Amino acid sequence: MILKHRRPNIYGLMNKEGNKEEVEMIINELLNRDYKITFLPSGSSAVFLSMWIAKIYSNEISIPDMGGWQGFLKFPKLLNLKNNMIETNLGIIDLEKLDESLKENSSLILTSLAGYLAPQPLKEIKKLCEEREVLFIEDISGKIGGDCGYGDIVVCSTGTPKILNCEYGGFLGISKEIEEKLGNALNDIKILSKTYKTINYFGLLKEELLNAKKTYKKYVEASKIIKDEIENAYFREFEGISVFIECDNPKNISKKINSLIKLDNRKSITTICPNYDRILKNGIVFETKKIDISELNREVINEIIIALSSIL
């Protein structure tokens, strides 16, 4: 079977430019706190800038031991930040272990949706960070449209394939409380952010934002159906926009899956694990989020399940 890959909103592509202030308002409507938004050319630049801010707070930053993003590992080295690796339950933060290892006046960065596979206990993490005066940085790329936006700082990619699928860009949001704490350092952040060249894609981003809840819900529902039918699928009880399936010889399994389920842009529909960005366990991630949501009706999902079951 050949499936359409995730595409940007067609109306947004036809009306790509737009009003930045409108987009900032819609972003804040989707989140649980209000943020001052800085638009950037990529999600990675947003993560880097958030860690640059973290260094103002402390020389140490905590990251999850899996289910994050490669930049969480690389950028602290560039900024001379010490990495404090937090032990997780397959990417999901264990609150007791976080309580034991999180130092006062430090920083923590994680993704709202661990490895795109399962949600973090964001409310509880926020509470613990407030008690310890820890700067909480939340990467909302995989969960915007769902329950997210609890961090002191949020970062988001609007590249591909993401919930906000503009094939370009990203943004950083700083909460009003953190803006006040940063004081004069806020001017340095503004100067640094201006070194990043950005384009006007706010018409497209607006359409993606307006569809974010529907997009997130569709990927969660499709992934749930697949998880319920595949024997070795993990995180059945959790929301996720992709599916981890434990297996031996994941490279071979991945090759077989991609021979039966193809994307029309010829990209792989699987991620081979162990992989820090997903999960450090043998298996594959079936990347539901790479499929265009227009394809995800019950008939197509059933065909996917039949194809996966014939291999696994």
From Swiss-Prot:
Superkingdom per UniProt: Archaea
Protein name in the entry: Uncharacterized protein MJ1341
Transmembrane segments: none
Organism placement in taxonomy: Archaea, Methanobacteriati, Methanobacteriota, Methanomada group, Methanococci
InterPro entries xrefs: DegT/StrS_aminotransferase, PyrdxlP-dep_Trfase, PyrdxlP-dep_Trfase_major
Gene Ontology molecular function, alphabetical: pyridoxal phosphate binding; transaminase activity
GO annotation terms (biological process): polysaccharide biosynthetic process
Disulfide bonds: none
